[in-house]
Amino acid sequence: IPEDAWVLSPNAFDQPKPAARHTVSFTRGIPTALDGKAMDPVTLIETLEAVGGPYGIGRGIHVGDTVLGTKGRVAFEAPAADILLTAHRELEKLVLSGPQQRIKDQVATQYGDFVHEGKQLDPVCRDIEALLTSAQQRVTGDVKIVLRPGNLFIEGVISPHSLLAATKGVYGEKAGEWTPADALGYSRILSLPGILQTRAGGKK
């Protein structure tokens, strides 16, 4: 695709740019502020488009399947969507349980497929929306982002509902919620199915 075809990110990678830092705030999963300034969703999206476009954020070419089963190839620019989705996902990692994240990701993908196929009026979409709404009750906090040409980096996440802050340990460094003996017993229980299968097969 020719460079002049890009609308939001023309020549985004031609010249070096200094890193730009911003903070995106969410309330129950909804983006509500940028750099501490409250904004309605439309204004916030328009602002992020202007902020991320010059860095080539959300710019790409996609090959996918159409509803009719044919292949399609499109060039797209979606800086606001890229920033919001990435920031929102990092906030969810901090406040949602592992099972919540996995189930939400599964149904969100299915929901997207339904909408893409024109099935958004099917009652199952209301069921999925109820689950997604429930899952967002604690998705509140601030996400610090750093923009560089072609790169979106998450610098930090803060939330009053942080599950990391609720533990006494530091991930990858030390544990505060269990003892070495607890860890030994837990490891033994987790490995028990494999131990029994090996024993039943005559292997030691």
Residue ranges and their predicted role:
Residues 1-204:
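Nucleotide-activated chemistry modules centered on ATP-dependent adenylation/adenylyltransferase
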